[in-house]
């Protein structure tokens, strides 16, 4: 083959770099979210006071490993900031103020430091009470705002209903005016608008006659109470037919997706119907460990593979990374200089097989043709 030292990898196409950068971007996004949320809670309006107090306190170690030290309330207002390392520690009475010259020395553990350390728990308790009261005040404020907004919403709705009432009244007033005009026209023309008892009695007698005639003859509404089977048949068809059609549809979709999945897995989505007689095969010259196992194919020295494509998927140009398929069915890209193409040796078609057939044909053509007289002589 060649020497054992593997050559340098060629430059990757844009499709491989895009897949690798997307995975790295996902990882960096997770790191950014973690660091951003961690630092944002501590560096807010109150600095490390409420940030580290409620962030690291209730989140990681309030009374555990942090206690009132760096994790719980230590890094808050009265821990590492005011009475710890800030004001009365190394800054106030420690090294800066009265540390080196008077009382506390390098460590800041004099009278002021001991008082600050002793009163730290009390101030932290007061701080937690103030925080709880502040939270309760925020809840009350939110409740008040919700009640206020809902109250004014109801007022605006009542106002809109009053406008609707006015609009409906004006619309119904038109019909009132029309009825009033009809009455005036009836009075002018002598039409009686009021129904007299005699007229009502006549109307009632006519209705009774119509009802008796319909009961005797059957009438036009004879089959009104007969039950119809159409709603029942439609209901049964919907109950039985809809699940059947849905099952057929799901089976068809599953079969289609399975065929597409097999087609993509076999590499047919990019290469179409591959002809095995026209495929090129290659042998790995060196071991290759891919950086992105989803896009690249791992190679072992001497491994055989089939070359599916030598072009880039996006631009269809000649690429330095070839798409190959291994014996176990895995598909991926490999560098072109890590493999060698296996040349096929075509067997020549032997011409000796055609010579006997040609000789037999020539002999048959040279044989004399027997006519009818010679055939009669041969019979006698």
Swiss-Prot record:
BP GO annotations: protein import into peroxisome matrix, docking
Location(s) in or outside the cell: Peroxisome membrane
Topology feature Cytoplasmic, residues: 252-380
SUPFAM superfamilies the record matches: SH3-domain
Transmembrane segments: 231-251
Topology within the bilayer: Single-pass membrane protein
Residue spans, topological domain Lumenal: 1-230
Domain annotation SH3: ranges: 277-344
Extent of Polar residues compositional bias: 12-30
One Pfam family from the record: Peroxin-13_N
Signal peptide: none
Region described as Disordered: spans on this chain: 1-30
Annotated keywords: Membrane, Peroxisome, Protein transport, SH3 domain, Translocation, Transmembrane, Transmembrane helix, Transport
GO cellular component term, pick one: peroxisomal membrane
PROSITE patterns recorded: SH3 (PS50002)
Family of this protein: Belongs to the peroxin-13 family.
Subunit relationships: Interacts (via SH3 domain) with PEX14 (via SH3-binding motif); forming the PEX13-PEX14 docking complex.
Alphabetized PANTHER family for the sequence: PEROXISOMAL MEMBRANE PROTEIN PEX13
Function: Component of the PEX13-PEX14 docking complex, a translocon channel that specifically mediates the import of peroxisomal cargo proteins bound to PEX5 receptor. The PEX13-PEX14 docking complex forms a large import pore which can be opened to a diameter of about 9 nm. Mechanistically, PEX5 receptor along with cargo proteins associates with the PEX14 subunit of the PEX13-PEX14 docking complex in the cytosol, leading to the insertion of the receptor into the organelle membrane with the concomitant translocation of the cargo into the peroxisome matrix.
Protein name listed in UniProt: Peroxisomal membrane protein PEX13
Organism: Komagataella pastoris (Yeast)
Annotated gene: PEX13
């Amino acid at each position: 083959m060649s020497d054992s030292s593997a050559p340098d990898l060629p430059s990757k196409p844009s499709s491989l770099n895009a897949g690798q950068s997307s995975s790295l971007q996902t990882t960096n996004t997770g790191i950014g979210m973690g660091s951003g949320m961690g630092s944002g809670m501590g560096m807010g309006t109150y600095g490390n006071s409420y940030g580290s107090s409620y962030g690291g306190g209730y989140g990681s170690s309030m009374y555990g490993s942090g206690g009132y030290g760096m994790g719980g309330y230590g890094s808050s207002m009265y821990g590492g900031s005011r009475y710890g390392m800030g004001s009365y520690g190394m800054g106030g009475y420690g090294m800066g103020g009265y540390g080196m010259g008077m009382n506390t020395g390098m460590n800041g553990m004099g009278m002021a430091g001991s008082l600050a350390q002793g009163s730290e728990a009390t101030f932290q308790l007061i701080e937690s009470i103030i925080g709880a009261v502040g939270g309760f005040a925020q809840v009350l404020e939110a409740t008040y705002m919700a009640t206020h907004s809902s109250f004014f919403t109801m007022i605006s709705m009542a106002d809109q209903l009053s406008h609707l009432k006015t609009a409906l009244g004006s619309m119904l007033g038109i019909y009132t005016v029309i009825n009033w005009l009809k009455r005036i026209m009836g009075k002018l023309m002598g039409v009686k608008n009021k129904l007299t008892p005699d007229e009502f009695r006549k109307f009632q007698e006519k209705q009774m006659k119509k009802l008796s005639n319909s009961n005797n003859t059957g009438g036009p509404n004879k089959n009104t109470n007969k039950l119809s089977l159409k709603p029942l048949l439609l209901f049964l068809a919907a109950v039985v037919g809809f699940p059947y059609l849905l099952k057929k549809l799901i089976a068809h979709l599953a079969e289609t997706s399975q065929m597409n999945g097999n087609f993509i897995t076999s590499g047919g989505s990019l290469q179409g119907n591959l002809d095995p007689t026209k495929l090129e095969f290659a042998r790995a010259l060196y071991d290759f460990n891919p950086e992105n196992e989803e896009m690249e194919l791992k190679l072992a020295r001497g491994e055989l593979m089939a070359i599916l494509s030598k072009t880039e998927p996006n631009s269809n140009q000649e690429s330095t990374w070839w798409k190959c398929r291994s014996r176990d069915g895995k598909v991926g890209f490999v560098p072109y200089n890590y493999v060698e193409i296996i040349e096929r040796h075509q067997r020549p078609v032997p011409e000796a097989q055609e010579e006997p057939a040609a000789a037999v044909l020539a002999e048959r053509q040279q044989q004399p043709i027997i006519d009818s007289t010679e055939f009669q002589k041969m019979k006698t």
